[in-house]
Amino acid sequence: MESKRVVVTGLGAITPIGKTFPEYWEGLVNGRNGAGEITRFDSTLYKTHFACEVKDYNPEDYFEKKNVRKYDHFAQFGLIAADEAIADSGISAENCDLDEVGVMMTSGIGGVNHLYHETMEYAQGDGTPRFGPFLITKMIVNMIGGVISIKYGFRGPNYATVSACASSTHSIIEAFDKIRFGKCIAVVAGGGGAAIGQLGIGGFNAMKALSTRNDDPMTASRPFDLNRDGFVMGEGAGSLVLEEYEHAIARGAKIYAEVVGGGSSADAYHITAPHPEGAGGVLSMQRALNDAGLTPEAIDHINAHGTSTPMGDLAECMAIQKVFGEHAYNISINSTKSMTGHLLGGAGAVEAIATILALKNGIIPPTINHFDDDPQIDSKLDIVFNKARQRDIHYGLSNSFGFGGQNATVIFKKFE
């Protein structure tokens, strides 16, 4: 069966540097820093006291009180981003068969904060099991897709792909496959994360994954820098409406970019550490290129996973050089996590949006907080440090690599 073309017709985002996708893009281009002291809870006893929170977030600005009680923050963020993307795309019952509209929205670890609070209330009680009626539904990852379909009546395929930090990139690839192979005419894809809480910060501290640069949190997320010491937790969500090309053209939709390939792989190495030579990332990128029918020389830009961890950033650079060879030096590379922090399961979605808007606008957002070169990272790699750069690009690749060694890569093409 001949595969169909797939395009992006709607975008939505709520992030630490902007609560709509235009605000997010403006923040990226201007190098806005989303880090600050944690306000979600008292972090005094924790090793990390800072994160990239969504600023001035009040759920009641977006939801009725009865729904604030029902949805954990990760699902709230996911629905906010999806609302924006759906409105931006213009898909509705008037121009789409809702039976053929799917939802592939996800999260890396779901409602961990709500789980913590309910568990603590139980532990501090007399042992009588008293749990709220929304405990389970506020925890489970697939609830984002559920609430979106309930609100909009989308009755197509609806499930969540969970692969830690690669979750929402996998969701975009799933959506791409559903449309190109004729199972859907449109899919709302993406994901969210809201793990800035006692469990999230405490758990990642215990793994030694988070930066502990408490004396200078604004410069803590510094991908590819010599003195990087771990990632900075972020929160928020991103959502994209993917649509079959002919259907989008027929209804006069605006088109941001075309999705042309996706690849995934496993490191088969370690539960948290990347393969030291980036072997899984190599396979993921190669498979995305093969899926798109592209040679390595076609890629102009890479939005790197780039978490600001000592091992991860180095392994990704090694993987890029192995896949692209000498052409790697012609590719602009950035990490937007330097500004947003790491949104965990939502990271791939907001970074896909950054890649798409870089293609559309011809601007590469910077990797901020670069001070000292890492001698282990090839200095000839064109990492865009500290200031945005104008550049006409035609193919952009976005990487997401998750704990468990689960990797995903998606490739977008500029729509002309």
Regions found by a protein language model. Give the residues of each.
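ACP-dependent fatty acid/polyketide chain-elongation machinery
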Residues: 1-67, 89, 246-256, 353-367, ...
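Flexible, low-complexity linker/loop segments at domain and module junctions
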Residues: 1-8, 95-98, 292-298, 329, ...
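Condensing-enzyme catalytic core mediating Claisen C-C bond formation in acyl metabolism
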Residues: 5-9, 36, 215-292, 300-301
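Conserved beta-ketoacyl condensing-enzyme motif
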Residues: 8, 24-25, 29-163, 178, ...
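Acyl-CoA/ACP chain-elongation machinery
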Residues: 39, 183-229, 262-276, 306-313, ...
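Active-site-proximal alpha-helical scaffold in enzymes
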Residues: 78-91, 144-145, 149-152, 157-193, ...
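Phosphate/pyrophosphate-binding loops at sites that engage ATP/ADP/AMP, CoA/4′-phosphopantetheine
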Residues: 85-97, 248-252, 285-301, 323-327
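Glycine-/small-residue-rich "gating" segment that lines the acyl/pantetheine channel
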Residues: 125-132, 173, 177, 181, ...
